[in-house]
From Swiss-Prot:
Residues spanning the signal sequence: none
Lineage: Bacteria, Pseudomonadati, Bacteroidota, Bacteroidia, Bacteroidales
Single GO biological process annotation from the record: protein quality control for misfolded or incompletely synthesized proteins
Stated family: Belongs to the PTH family.
Gene: pth
Pfam families: Pept_tRNA_hydro
GO CC, any one term: cytoplasm
Origin species: Porphyromonas gingivalis (strain ATCC 33277 / DSM 20709 / CIP 103683 / JCM 12257 / NCTC 11834 / 2561)
Name of the protein this chain belongs to: Peptidyl-tRNA hydrolase
Amino acid sequence: MKYLIVGLGNIGGEYNGTRHNVGFRMVNALAEDGGVQFVEARYGAIAHMRVKNAELILLKPNTYMNLSGNAVRYWMQQENIPREQVLVLVDDLALPFGTLRLKPKGSDAGHNGLKNIAEVMGSIDYARLRFGLGDEFSKGRQVDFVLGRFTPEEEEKLPELTKHAVEIIKSFCLAGIQRTMNRYN
């Protein structure tokens, strides 16, 4: 079976390492685990890998966060991947830092990337793996927080957290969403 694994983030060097780009960080960790490299393609950088009998198409949209839906739709159509086999990797302010939560569907929770994907797909019925950023910011400073860098203490924990995310992604593809949620949520 084929799966589309989409890491959300903003393109451009100024966004590398920011909290909002943790989706890119997770999909990069998956590519590294699979020993594959991304190549530039239409609407983003793409990598192909296998995990046992599952074929994974990894995508880092180059459309900016708020237009991610165009890239997702294009690659779903290009690779003939149904919505049930799409997993979007995304940051989440509502979860404490480092919390990983797999969801089968849901609202955009104020995330513009998820909002655009839902608009373009015409549905909120697609899986997402949310990476908790926490809410350690002053009122009105949300944008600065998500576009800011992780603290040194957080950065120290990221390798282990992204490794855990890779396990969840692989389980999603091999065992299905329900079993994976039961095991990891």
